[in-house]
Amino acid sequence: IEFHRDNAFKFRPSRQYDLIWSAGLFDYLDEKTFKMLLTKQLGFLKEGGEMVIGNFSLNNPTRDYMEFGNWFLHHRSPEELIQIACDCGISEDNINVKSESLGVNLFLHISK
């Protein structure tokens, strides 16, 4: 297992990975930037690998409090995450969206 804490836009790995996990990043990105970074990071994923991207769902009971404190995120639905992945050329057969038990955090799973 390797952990990288780096600028996601400048990161240039020397190899590909079996798993790429990203939490706390993509929900800050608008749709255009999300797609650009997703497409880039897919190139770092081995054939047969999996990418998991966390994103806050529309079902966030603390959203008003977060935004009152100037913490603004792009909350997305499972359907939006699937559409974004499809727009990046990923087959819907290779896409799955799961959530944790409260349904506040979504996880976009993409297999390559």
Task: Please report, for each region that a protein language model flagged, where it lies by residue.
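Helix-to-beta-strand junctions that scaffold the AdoMet/dcAdoMet cofactor pocket
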Residues: 29-30, 45-47
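Hydrophobic adenine-recognition pocket in adenosine-nucleotide-binding enzymes
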Residues: 25
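Conserved acidic residues
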Residues: 18
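Class I (Rossmann-like) S-adenosyl-L-methionine-dependent methyltransferase catalytic domain
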Residues: 1-15, 32-36, 40, 50-112
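A conserved beta-strand element that flanks and buttresses the S-adenosyl-L-methionine
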Residues: 21
